[in-house]
Amino acid sequence: MERSPPQSPGPGKAGDAPNRRSGHVRGARVLSPPGRRARLSSPGPSRSSEAREELRRHLVGLIERSRVVIFSKSYCPHSTRVKELFSSLGVECNVLELDQVDDGARVQEVLSEITNQKTVPNIFVNKVHVGGCDQTFQAYQSGLLQKLLQEDLAYDYDLIIIGGGSGGLSCAKEAAILGKKVMVLDFVVPSPQGTSWGLGGTCVNVGCIPKKLMHQAALLGQALCDSRKFGWEYNQQVRHNWETMTKAIQNHISSLNWGYRLSLREKAVAYVNSYGEFVEHHKIKATNKKGQETYYTAAQFVIATGERPRYLGIQGDKEYCITSDDLFSLPYCPGKTLVVGASYVALECAGFLAGFGLDVTVMVRSILLRGFDQEMAEKVGSYMEQHGVKFLRKFIPVMVQQLEKGSPGKLKVLAKSTEGTETIEGVYNTVLLAIGRDSCTRKIGLEKIGVKINEKSGKIPVNDVEQTNVPYVYAVGDILEDKPELTPVAIQSGKLLAQRLFGASLEKCDYINVPTTVFTPLEYGCCGLSEEKAIEVYKKENLEIYHTLFWPLEWTVAGRENNTCYAKIICNKFDHDRVIGFHILGPNAGEVTQGFAAAMKCGLTKQLLDDTIGIHPTCGEVFTTLEITKSSGLDITQKGCUG
C-alpha cells in the first residue's frame, strides 16, 4: 500500500510526530544523535574568519555529497513535518539537529549567509536549496520535489545560462573556472528592420560600446573646431563620413564578439546559438535559426536575457522607424532625424547625431531623463538646445507615414499634444524610437516552471542572492526588478552569483551607490541619490547641498561658454555631512565620477573632500573647494577657470 504524505502544515500548527522530543523519524539519518554533542568546525576563536570559512566549506561539502540534507532542530514541529514528508516518500535524509551540536548557532549563521534563510528547517535536495517547511510542501505539491528526488538523477549541465550578454557571460566564465559544466544559450531575435548581432549582448553590440565610440566621434568634431584657437591650421573642408565610422566601429565589435567566443571555448563553456525556452522543471528547449530543436537539462539555471527597445504601437512604427538596435550598424547616414523619447539613450543618440552636423529634433512626452536628478537633466537639455538640438516638448507621435523610399527615405510624422488637442506634423529622413526597453522574459517558458514576473514590466523579482521564487532558477542583469540597468552591475552580480552557487564565496552584489554617466555632448556623471530622492528619504531640512558652476581650462582659449558646467554634492547634515549624492555636468564626467564613487563606498564626507588637495587644473578638483550651499542663495557664477 502506498504511504500518504502528511498534509502541508497550517500556520502555527505543529501536528503529531513520532518522538517529538528529538524530531527523529524513520529514514532520517541523524548526523548528531542525541546524547553526543558534535563539533563541525575546528576549535579555536569562535568568530575567527578561518574557522568560519572552514565551517562554510564543511557545509557546502555536506550539501554537495548528500541527496537530501535537512538542517533542523529536534524540538521544531515544522522540522518534524518536513522529516515526516521525506519519510513518507521513502527518502533517506541527512539530518543535522542544530540544537544538538556545539556550534549549532554558528552553523545557522553561516547557512543564512549561504541561503538568505535564517530559520529551520532548511532543506537541500540534490544540491538545490529548496527552502523551509512551506517551500518544501509547495515544491511537493507542484511536482518539483519529486523531480529533484528522481533516482540516479543526472543532468546534462551543472548550470545553463539563458542569455549571452554581460551578466550571463560573467556568470558562465566564473562557474567554469570553479570546475562546473556550463552552457550558454544565446539567440538574437532580429529587430523589425532585420538587424541582428553576435555574442555579447546589448552593451557590446548595440549599446555602451558603439554609443561611446560615436560620442567620441562627435567630440573629435568639436575638438577640430577648438583646435584653430590653439594654432592648428588646415585648409581642407572638414566633414563627417558616416560609412567610414560605422565600418570601423562594426569591425571593432566583431573582434569583441570573436573574443567572447574564444574565451568561452578556452574555459570549456558550451556555447549554443539557439533560443532557450523552459519546457518543464530543469529542462529547456533550444531552437536554432533553422527551427531545429534540442533539449538540455541542468541542476541550476540563470536567466540573463536582457531587454529590447519598446515600440509605440502606432501606425508605421515597426515598418518605418528604427531603434538603437539598428542605428549603430545603419549602412547610410540617417540625415534629418526625429528622436522620440527623453531617456538617456534618446539624448545620447541625439547628441552625437547633432555633433556630426545632422538636423536633429527630440520629441519629449514629459520630462528629460526620468529617474535622474531633474536639475541636472534640465541642464543637459539646455546645453544640447544651445548646440543645435531642437526639442518638441509635450508631444507624442500618433502616426508615421512613408513619403519616399531610400537610404534614407522620407517619413511624415503626425504628433499630438499631451496637454490639449493641438497636432503637428513634420518630415524627416529617419525616426529613431528611444522610449524605453522591455524585459525579454515573456516568451521563455517561465510560466511552465512557475517563475514569477512583474506582469506589468516583465521584470523578475529576486531576493538578495538573485534567486527567483523557484529555488534552482536565478536571474541577473537588466531584467531584475528594482535594480540598476547597467553593464558593470550585471557583470559583478553574475560573477558573485556563480561564486555563491558553487561555494567559492558568500559575497553579495552591492546595488547601493552605483555610479553612472549619461554620455550626452556635455557628459553628466552621478552617484548616489538625486536631489529629489534625497529630499524624499531624508527631508530637506536634514540636507546641505553644495554646488558651483565651473569653467574647464581647455574651454577658455577655445572661447567656449563659461558658467555651463556644474557640480553638486548632497550631504546628510546629521551623519557627519556624509555625501549621499554626487553630480557633475562637464567634460569627461564619467572619468571624474568613477573615483568619487569609490570614495562614497568608503563613507565620503564633506570634511574629507575639504581635506583633499585637488589636482590642478582639472574639472574634478572643483569638489575639493565647494563652499556655497543652495540654502545660502549666494551667486555661484565664476569669473575664471580657477574660481
Curated annotation (Swiss-Prot):
GO biological process per UniProt: cell differentiation; cell redox homeostasis; spermatogenesis
GO cellular component: cytoplasm; cytosol; endoplasmic reticulum; mitochondrion; nucleoplasm
Necessary cofactors: FAD
Keyword Plastid belongs to the record: no
Cross-referenced Gene3D superfamilies: 3.30.390.30, FAD/NAD(P)-binding domain, Glutaredoxin
SUPFAM superfamilies: FAD/NAD(P)-binding domain (SSF51905), FAD/NAD-linked reductases, dimerisation (C-terminal) domain (SSF55424), Thioredoxin-like (SSF52833)
Stretches assigned to coiled coil: none
Keywords: Cytoplasm, Developmental protein, Differentiation, Disulfide bond, Electron transport, Endoplasmic reticulum, FAD, Flavoprotein, Methylation, Microsome, NADP, Nucleus, Oxidoreductase, Phosphoprotein, Redox-active center, Selenocysteine, Spermatogenesis, Transport
Reaction catalyzed: [thioredoxin]-dithiol + NADP(+) = [thioredoxin]-disulfide + NADPH + H(+)
Locations listed in the record: Cytoplasm; Nucleus; Microsome; Endoplasmic reticulum
Major localization class: cytoplasm
InterPro entries on file: FAD/NAD-bd_sf, FAD/NAD-binding_dom, FAD/NAD-linked_Rdtase_dimer_sf, Glutaredoxin, Glutaredoxin_euk/vir, GSHR/TRXR-like, Pyr_nucl-diS_OxRdtase_dimer, Pyr_OxRdtase_I_AS
SS bond partners: C203-C208
Entry annotation: catalytic residues: H616
Cofactor descriptive note: Binds 1 FAD per subunit.
Crosslink (Cysteinyl-selenocysteine (Cys-Sec)) position: C641-U642
Sites of Phosphoserine modification: S41, S42
MF terms in GO: flavin adenine dinucleotide binding; thioredoxin-disulfide reductase (NADPH) activity
Superkingdom as given in the UniProt entry: Eukaryota
Modified residues (Asymmetric dimethylarginine): R26
Record's function text: Displays thioredoxin reductase, glutaredoxin and glutathione reductase activities. Catalyzes disulfide bond isomerization. Promotes disulfide bond formation between GPX4 and various sperm proteins and may play a role in sperm maturation by promoting formation of sperm structural components.
Family: Belongs to the class-I pyridine nucleotide-disulfide oxidoreductase family.
SUBUNIT field: Homodimer.
Annotated domain remarks: The N-terminal glutaredoxin domain does not contain the C-X-X-C redox-active motif normally found in glutaredoxins but activity may be mediated through a single cysteine. The C-terminal Cys-Sec motif of one subunit of the homodimer may transfer electrons from the thiol-disulfide center to the glutaredoxin domain of the other subunit.
The protein's name in its UniProt record: Thioredoxin reductase 3
Gene: TXNRD3
